[in-house]
UniProtKB/Swiss-Prot annotation:
Xref: InterPro entries: AMP-bd_C (IPR025110), AMP-bd_C_sf (IPR045851), AMP-binding_CS (IPR020845), AMP-dep_synth/lig_dom (IPR000873), ANL_N_sf (IPR042099)
Entry comment describing in which tissues the protein is expressed: High expression in young leaves and flowers. Not expressed in roots.
Chief location: plastid
Protein name stated in the entry: 2-succinylbenzoate--CoA ligase, chloroplastic/peroxisomal
Short sequence motif named Microbody targeting signal, residue ranges: 558-560
Phenotype caused by lack of the gene: Lack of phylloquinone and seedling lethal.
Catalysed reactions, semicolon-separated: 2-succinylbenzoate + ATP + CoA = 2-succinylbenzoyl-CoA + AMP + diphosphate
Gene name in the database record: AAE14
UniProt subcellular location: Plastid, Chloroplast membrane; Peroxisome membrane
Source species taxonomy: Eukaryota, Viridiplantae, Streptophyta, Embryophyta, Tracheophyta
Amino acid sequence: MANHSRPHICQCLTRLASVKRNAVVTVYGNRKRTGREFVDGVLSLAAGLIRLGLRNGDVVSIAAFNSDLFLEWLLAVALVGGVVAPLNYRWSLKEAKMAMLLVEPVLLVTDETCVSWCIDVQNGDIPSLKWRVLMESTSTDFANELNQFLTTEMLKQRTLVPSLATYAWASDDAVVICFTSGTTGRPKGVTISHLAFITQSLAKIAIAGYGEDDVYLHTSPLVHIGGLSSAMAMLMVGACHVLLPKFDAKTALQVMEQNHITCFITVPAMMADLIRVNRTTKNGAENRGVRKILNGGGSLSSELLKEAVNIFPCARILSAYGMTEACSSLTFMTLHDPTQESFKVTYPLLNQPKQGTCVGKPAPHIELMVKLDEDSSRVGKILTRGPHTMLRYWGHQVAQENVETSESRSNEAWLDTGDIGAFDEFGNLWLIGRSNGRIKTGGENVYPEEVEAVLVEHPGIVSAVVIGVIDTRLGEMVVACVRLQEKWIWSDVENRKGSFQLSSETLKHHCRTQNLTGFKIPKRFVRWEKQFPLTTTGKVKRDEVRRQVLSHFQIMTSSL
């Protein structure tokens, strides 16, 4: 008999089937489903998977855009004790095969956007693969090939719907394998438990204030931990899910009005797109229906925050810092609260007004520790432990990598986030940079994120990437690549008073006025014309930026 004191992500279904029985809980295009209809769909699919032969611990890979059926598959696989491994639809077939060879799925589910993967994966390419399923088909483009695949509806047919009391678990309580983006090298499969998902979802519910009356717009892909964790929080409170296949700023703004959206999550690039499109298509019109916005994946600049408040004046805007290995958010910070007229983010601390980026306080259940560097009294590695952390990287028996042991509790492991930071006297965590991304210049350590945070405070800069390049005198030289705001121009001649001009000297002066230490100020600046190269989860590919900069410089010589 199943032990129902154990956490399971499908425990949310009982609430949906009762409290939200006749209320709409999912909207996908013209398709709307009530709580009862959604739960019946999950249970029918789960029964079909059992009849097919899916067993506890079997891995199911899903490659698809966001949809109500994606949520249905996530919960149905979990219900029968399977493990879901979402594949990024932006990957090439080669990358998808690499991921599948790692996690060894028995079943591959795709929608029409990734159906070619089902077709192109030949027998023997993925030895573990037994079944291929098309999530939903409205096209005849692949009619001949699709005859060999199962469909969601086929699996639901002629099955006895199981009871909600028939949860199953994988042997180690694993439920999802999320792939890290990996700015270099191959992505790793982060294995996440039922407990981690529920713990982190409860944190979002408590801190963001999500409730059953919320209407949530899915802006983040369900292949990423941010999208999955927030989706789980909404399932638990019984909110209504409005799903777009993928993010598009113009469509998102339209859907916000049409469906009376109250909350969504974002990253700085998404918010910038929403602001730009709102300015050009809606003349900066307000949306007073949105009440909660959770930003992740990087800090919002003061300019972006100001513009966001103008568009969403009634929204409480929060920022979160987290990582895939911690099942999403570790800390939260309120950036704007419309209920407090004089609300303003303040930055007390570290004997300097701004050192790095403040990311707020840990969630109530989160343990964070800064393991101090030998040569520092306050800065060090950021470590975490608790029920939110990953079980392991898939293929490893335990979470051997990124793990440190506390000197005070030698039998309890801490997860190394890979970030460098410090706590202030109020308990706020400040990010200084990545431990593996620091620049060693003239014997001093420089963390790119700290310099970037200063640069984007200039009104003429929309984004910045700081890298280190080989220098004959300094070892590494600090170089900043900057993207300019609209109407600003780059000129290394003396600025005309009142003009929207930027130059290396004006940016160096800006850094000095922001109290950035001299050796951290970039020695050279590169104006970046296009978008910075990003991973599929929106992280900057610093190695690629460095390659392009070196190509631009051609031959590096000492700048001093």
